[in-house]
Amino acid sequence: MKRKILFVVTLLSTLAFMSCKKDGATPSPSTPEATETTPTTPTEVDTVALKKQIEQEKETLSKPYNEEEDAQAKLDALIAQASKEGKYVFVQAGGNWCIWCLRFNDFVQQTPELKQVVDENFVYYHLNYSKNNKNKAVFDKYTPNSKGLGYPFFFVIDGTGHVTNIISSETLEEGKGYSVAKVKEMFVANAPKK
């Protein structure tokens, strides 16, 4: 019974509020209320604006993923190089379609303390995943349990071709980008022990 009364009171209050007009005035044809527009919610407008902003940002960032590359052949060469240099292969999985992938690449390249840690410890590779080239065999071989991870995600391969770790980028995010401290800590923790 109390629910019915509460519902009726809420309904009547809502109807009364909706029927009120500011100062009792009727909107004139020149006021915004009188013009016919397609109703849009702020969320829809924000989504459209956000998509446009992301596309503009993508245009300014380098595109490190190569859809046409033979990823397994490239990884074989990088593993041999890493073994020779006493480094690991750091693989960033994603694609040029992924704003977070492009942001991470730019973040590492533009942050001297991160770039130094990477250059000293890793051979870096961008493993493409896209509609045109999903590199299914490579992902199945190195990261068979990564299906729940978002892009980018990372994995580290030692000089013998063994995957030492798979890392979600979600733990490294901060706002619209990444945390220098968290990313540096991740690189250091996954570097070869010297």
Language-model-detected regions and their locations in the chain:
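Thiol-based oxidoreductase modules, predominantly thioredoxin-like and allied folds used
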Residues: 69, 115-136
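Short active-site neighborhood of thiol/selenol oxidoreductases, capturing the structured segment around
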Residues: 84-99
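Non-catalytic, surface beta->alpha helical segment in thiol-disulfide oxidoreductase systems
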Residues: 149-194
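N-terminal leader/targeting and pre-domain segments
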Residues: 31, 38-85
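Positively charged n-region of N-terminal signal peptides that target proteins for export
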Residues: 1-4
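Bacterial signal peptide processing site
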Residues: 21-23
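C-terminal motif of bacterial Sec signal peptides marking the signal peptidase cleavage site
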Residues: 16-19
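Typically the conserved alpha-helix immediately C-terminal to a functionally engaged Cys/Sec
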Residues: 102-117
